[in-house]
Amino acid sequence: MYLLILFLPLLGSLISGFGGRWLGCRGTNTFSTLCVVVSSLFSLLAFFEIGLTNTTCTIFLVSWIKSGAFYVSWGFLFDSLTVTMLVVITLVSSLVHIYSIKYMENDPHQPRFMSYLEIFTFFMLILVTADNLIQMFLGWEGVGLASYLLINFWYTRLAANQSAIKALIVNRVGDFGLSLGIFLIFWVFNSVDYSVIFSLVPLFDNQFLTFLGFKLHVLTLISLFLFIGAIGKSAQLGLHTWLPDAMEGPTPVSALIHAATMVTAGVFLMIRFSPLLEFSPTILFILITFGSLTAFFAAVTGVFQHDLKRVIAYSTCSQLGYMIFSCGMSCYDVSLFHLANHAFFKALLFLSAGSVIHAVSNEQDMRRMGSLLKFMPLTYSVMLIGTLALIGFPFLTGFYSKDFILELTQISSYSNLQMSYISFACWLGTMSVFFTSFYSFRLIYLTFLNNTNLAKSSLNLVHESSLLMIFPLIILSIGSIFAGYLIRDLFVGSGSDFWGAAIFILPKHSTFIEAEELPIVVKWLPFILSLLGIFFASFVQIFLKTFYFKSNLQNLLSFFTFLINKKWYWDVLYNRLIVLPILNFGYSISFKILDRGFIELSGPYGFTKFVSFWSQILIKLQTGQITHYLFFMIFTFCSFSIILVYSYINLTFNLLLLFFTLFFFI
């Protein structure tokens, strides 16, 4: 059963990809969706069998690499962390497959699309079930490759080409850091197996290595390289630029990437390596810093976006910041709890956005929408549920995890850390709630409630989506309402031993009990900020809309708006400092020198010219006259004689010098 969870999506991908021409769109859709649905059912069974009984299952398939101490096998680890991720991945993937049947029905390459979706799911399953770093890295790279194929699915579009290449290259930076971490882990622990690494970590707590004169803590350096990998995959500040541009792919791709796969890989990596991170306070501080900055930066940027999918994309970036933030506070279980909850309402938001885009003839600019409530009441209802869950409205899924993270941040700033920069990071995360609420309800107003800016011909074509697109939305909306309440006590309840040995937290880093001692105002603060964001968004959209465009307020904010719409100049910075110098170097060196004959001149062409040149000179010595040959012989003999005599004289002089030196000193 456990292996079927993994290999059913692979089977569906191979059949859809190679047999789609014979099966047709309907046959491909049915078979591929059935494979993922069955895999999700088996994942639920595995969750009940392993998660609820707090057991671990390890499956060994075959030895893979044997080279001295380097030993890698094909094996799979199923523990509470793994089965939770399996349920999230396969459930969301199943609903995305069902949704895609209708969404992509007019695309002639639908079998290829289904094949890409399933191979994406398969590589993510390999990533979370691996019991060693090499196998995990295979899944890690496979997810990156599949994301490139899906973002570039409409490969005739230039924007899709650019976005896919950008995602691939930016993630290569993080992958390079992860590969360095794997090399260093093998050098230190002499193994890449999880069980060996985690059992030996305490023994290396006081180990240091010297590099370029700097004394570095081994565990901190390893954790830093692993976190660089997480920065790339989970789109943290600095390597986040690929995530908004990934919206060029079909909307189901965006839902799968942002809800259950790809971006969650970095968070999963941090949670899986909690036994290592716990022994590195420096890395925990870095996680808190990056998480809070990412959450705040993405929330502020989302306020000024006009593309429907980009607004939701920046909300993903912000929520990933909360997850990394939580890992930095050693609350790995809360981070995974939020990851699971986030999968429901984020998939719901993206698929609802796809339903809207599908209805308005592929228009994505929210300013051109409006008045869609009376045409699409069901889509409006489920999107409102997803929005409320995103902002952490009480008793919805996001409330139980997001507010818990914010409470724990306040514990960190109030009690055990007592550092000004940690407090600042905590308040950044808290203030992000206001901006999240603002842009979320701005999206609702611009898309559904404001007066429409659509052409009458387009407005007449607006309609509610079909049952195959509505069914996943209903399932996800139910999950967005009840999932957080149902699994809260199991995942993060006081005294719950659900995670067992899958997550390790040092006793001094545990802060759950202190959450009960927070002032009531601090506990209510996220909800108050959410209400303020809703009120401010409503006030601006209803009352200040005309005033804003007729007053000088726009001029006052124009620079700030321009700065954010330029993505804070991250792309410009990378282009000026990295991309353009490399291109100029390539043009001046590679193109103008190497590609114009230097390699040929110093290679086979140059060697043949060299031989030909000297052969022509030597040919001229063959005159056929014996006097010339005698001259060359005498000249050669005299030359060698002079060299030998000079060498003998030099040797004799050195021996005499050595003799007199020893004589006088002795």
UniProtKB/Swiss-Prot annotation:
It is found in: Mitochondrion inner membrane. GO terms for biological process: ATP synthesis coupled electron transport; electron transport coupled proton transport. Keywords: Electron transport, Membrane, Mitochondrion, Mitochondrion inner membrane, NAD, Respiratory chain, Translocase, Transmembrane, Transmembrane helix, Transport, Ubiquinone. The chain crosses the membrane at residues 3-23, 31-51, 59-78, 82-101, 119-139, 168-190, 211-231, 251-271, 283-303, 311-333, 337-357, 375-395, 421-441, 467-487, 524-544, 572-594, 629-649. Its main location: mitochondrion. It catalyses: a ubiquinone + NADH + 5 H(+)(in) = a ubiquinol + NAD(+) + 4 H(+)(out). InterPro entries: NADH_DH_su5_C, NADHpl_OxRdtase_5_subgr, ND/Mrp_TM, NU5C-like, Proton_antipo_N. It is a multi-pass membrane protein. GO terms for cellular component: mitochondrial inner membrane. The keyword Mitochondrion applies. It holds the Pfam family Proton_antipo_N. The keyword Transport applies. Its EC number is 7.1.1.2. One of its GO terms (molecular function) is NADH dehydrogenase (ubiquinone) activity. It is an enzyme of class 7 (translocase). Belongs to the complex I subunit 5 family. NCBIfam families: NDH_I_L, PRK06590.1. Core subunit of the mitochondrial membrane respiratory chain NADH dehydrogenase (Complex I) that is believed to belong to the minimal assembly required for catalysis. Complex I functions in the transfer of electrons from NADH to the respiratory chain. The immediate electron acceptor for the enzyme is believed to be ubiquinone. This is NADH-ubiquinone oxidoreductase chain 5.
